[in-house]
Design a protein with these regions (language model features):
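Short alpha-helical DNA-recognition segment
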Residues: 25-44
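A short, Lys/Arg-rich alpha-helix, primarily the initiator
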Residues: 2-23
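Short, charged recognition helix plus adjacent turn
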Residues: 1-8, 62, 72-79
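Short, basic-rich loop-to-helix N-cap that marks the start of a DNA-contacting helix
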Residues: 49-59, 78
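Alpha-helical residues within the helix-turn-helix
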Residues: 22, 33, 62
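DNA major-groove recognition helix of helix-turn-helix/homeodomain DNA-binding modules
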Residues: 55-70
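Residue-level signal for the short linker/turn that defines the boundary of a DNA-recognition helix
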Residues: 15, 25-26, 52-55
Length: 79
């Protein structure tokens, strides 16, 4: 996978997490606590700056009732 594609996936992941979080009326701090990470790391995920572990991705998909493909931008359908 090229670096450009990798960075685009991280950007989409961050955008989708932000959208889902805001739909639930949650703050970034609440998401960070839910995921047991620092606020700064969560902000970096939403900013498309860092990747997340596979298990965290699966937990987020379950929490928001969406597919991992949706979170990664591989599908436009949430389910």
């Amino acid at each position: 996978m090229s670096r450009r594609v990798y960075m685009e996936i991280l950007k989409i992941l961050g955008q989708r997490l932000r959208e889902l979080r805001m739909e639930r009326g949650m703050k970034q701090r609440e998401m960070a606590e839910l995921l047991e990470m620092t606020l700064r790391n969560y902000q970096r995920i939403e900013g498309g700056e860092i990747n997340i572990p596979t298990l965290t991705l699966c937990a987020l998909a379950d929490y928001f009732a969406v597919t991992t493909d949706y979170l990664l931008g591989r599908s436009g359908r949430r389910q």
